[in-house]
Swiss-Prot record:
Single GO term (MF): structural constituent of ribosome
InterPro entries per the UniProt record, alphabetical: Ribosomal_bL9/RNase_H1_N, Ribosomal_bL9_N, Ribosomal_bL9_N_sf
Assembly with partners or alone: Component of the mitochondrial large ribosomal subunit (mt-LSU). Mature yeast 74S mitochondrial ribosomes consist of a small (37S) and a large (54S) subunit. The 37S small subunit contains a 15S ribosomal RNA (15S mt-rRNA) and at least 32 different proteins. The 54S large subunit contains a 21S rRNA (21S mt-rRNA) and at least 45 different proteins.
Species classification: Eukaryota, Fungi, Dikarya, Ascomycota, Taphrinomycotina
Keywords: Mitochondrion, Ribonucleoprotein, Ribosomal protein, Transit peptide
This protein's name: Large ribosomal subunit protein bL9m
Length: 101
């Protein structure tokens, strides 16, 4: 019984011959399919959080920390939601000034 070696294929790249095994080819394709790290989210703190900041500070936190710790305890709010609330309040104040005149 003979031991079979993985076959290799030769490719020319910049006039160099490179031997690529099927395992290397599959690993190279899987490398791009791995999950990328999730970006940090910017949050506004509702009250003081130890090691993070004081009330009113805008901080960057990971999605998991916000979802599992800050959001259930109502210690932080998303900045995007805050911007939309400010816009809504500004529209309401413009409406109230128009009705008073």
């Amino acid at each position: 019984m003979s031991i079979m070696k993985p076959t290799t294929r030769f490719f020319r790249f910049n006039s160099l011959e490179l031997a690529v095994s099927p395992f290397q080819r599959i690993y190279g394709q899987l490398r791009f399919l791995r999950k990328q790290p999730k970006p940090f989210l910017v949050k506004l703190l509702n009250n003081e959080v130890s090691k993070l900041g004081r009330q009113g500070d805008v901080v960057s936190v990971t999605r998991g920390y916000y979802r599992n710790t800050l959001f259930p305890k109502k210690q932080a709010i998303a900045v995007d939601a805050l911007k939309s609330m400010k816009a809504h309040l500004l529209q309401g104040s413009e409406f109230s000034t128009k009705t008073k005149e």
